[in-house]
């Protein structure tokens, strides 16, 4: 960890991390019934995360949002993360865990949270296990070819930012000619992201299944049908 950090940032980070470890509430008290949500890109996690928050009243904890907030606040942990982000590097797991520990001390986390976008790897799941009690894990599962169809078919109106889809949400004929495909929506990019997902994140399904925590959701259906499956899963959890 030491290469990028200035001595001041490194020292302040260690102080903050020690404070987090000292003040973290006992497991089972601060993290009653936390939920992990994961699935491949384009599986509809964002939509279903909103549904889970509505059904459970648990706050959504996104590492992306936490990183942006920490950097904006200028906190020691945020400064540590910013050095890596500015260098175009992934923020190390121990910094992410430190940010999560801080988030779990907030009052609204007392009855558990919804982890969205974390963990992404088994080592991250092992680290999370040390600071949070995860009571259930929801995996939204969609075949690769369906994911490719969903994402590659997206088109954006550069004038309004509105997203259309060549099959599922066609644009009005009068604006079709100005629609563009975003670089992240090309088939090459999507399949590369899916490969990374299968190598790094998909193994979490078996890891959590071995612990009796996994709930698999068929995400290859309409938004409403997936939502019904999620609601049924939540009713079993609560």
PLM regions and their residue ranges:
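Glycine-rich phosphate-binding loop of ATP-dependent small-molecule kinases
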Residues: 2-238
């Amino acid at each position: 960890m030491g290469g990028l950090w200035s001595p001041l940032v490194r020292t302040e980070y260690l102080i903050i991390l020690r404070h987090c470890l000292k003040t973290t509430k006992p497991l089972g008290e601060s993290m009653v019934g936390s939920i992990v949500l994961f699935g491949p890109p384009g599986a509809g996690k964002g939509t279903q995360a909103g549904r889970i928050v509505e059904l459970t009243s648990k706050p959504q904890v996104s590492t992306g949002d936490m990183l942006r907030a920490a950097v904006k606040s200028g906190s020691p942990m945020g400064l540590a993360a910013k050095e890596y982000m500015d260098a175009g590097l992934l923020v190390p797991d121990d910094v992410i865990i430190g940010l999560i520990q801080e988030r779990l001390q907030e009052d609204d986390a007392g009855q558990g949270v919804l982890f969205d976008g974390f963990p992404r790897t088994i080592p991250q799941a092992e680290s999370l296990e040390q600071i949070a009690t995860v009571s259930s894990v929801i995996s939204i599962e969609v075949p690769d070819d369906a994911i490719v169809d969903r994402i590659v078919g997206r088109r954006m109106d550069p004038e309004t930012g509105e997203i259309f889809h060549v099959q599922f949400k066609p644009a009005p004929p009068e604006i079709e000619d100005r629609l563009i495909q975003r670089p992240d929506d090309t088939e090459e990019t999507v399949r590369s992201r899916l490969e990374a997902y299968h190598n790094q994140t998909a193994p979490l399904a078996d890891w959590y299944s071995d612990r009796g925590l996994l709930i698999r959701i068929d995400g290859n259906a309409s938004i409403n049908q997936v939502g019904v499956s999620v609601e049924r899963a939540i009713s079993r959890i609560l």
